[in-house]
Amino acid sequence: DPEEKFPPSNKQALNKLLEVAKKMDIHAELVTEEDAARLMEFDALFIRTTTSLNHYTFRLSQLAKQNGMVVIDDPLSIIRCTNKVYLNELFEKEKIPAPLSMLIFKSNENTFEQISEQLGSPFILKIPNGSFSFGMKKVTNEIELKAALDLLFDKSSILLAQEFTPTEFDWRIGILNGEPLFACKYYMAKGH
C-alpha cells in the first residue's frame, strides 16, 4: 500500500525483493488493493502492508489461502499476531519472557492503585489489535488512567495492561510452516 503511513517495508526494501526474485528467475510484482481481481494470476502472496482483521489484507489473505496459494501473512497468522491478548496468553503458556501483564475489563472498576500494585508505575494500556503505538497509552497516575480508559474502552471492552519496560527495540520473529525462519531487532523511532 503506497499510501500507508507506517509501512513494514520501505520502497528500497521492496525493490530489493524484486531484484532478488528476478535473479532467481521468479516473476514478482508489487500489487495493491486495486489488483485484487488479478490475485489468482499468481502462485503466492507475500503481504508487505500492515495487516489487521478489518483490513483488505486479511480478505486477500483468506482468498489466496482458500485458492491454494502460498501466503505470507496467512489468515491464521494475522488472527494470532494482531491480537495482543492472544499473544500474551501464548507467552504465558509457553513461558516466554514478557513484561508483566493483566487484562482490564470495561465492566470492572479499574483503579490506578490496583493496576500499579501488580505492574508497577508507569504502565502501558493497549487495545488488543493496535499497532505502531495506535491504541496504546502510558499511564503514570489516576487522572491519566481515567482519560486512557475513556479513550481506549471506546475501541475495545478488553484492554491489556503491561508493566512499562523501556527498550530500544522489539523482537520480530518470522515463522514459515511452523518453523522459525528469522529473528531480528525492530528498532524504535526516536521518542517512541
Outline where the language-model segments fall.
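Short, hinge-like loop/turn segments at secondary-structure boundaries
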Residues: 46-48, 89-92, 117-120, 142-143, ...
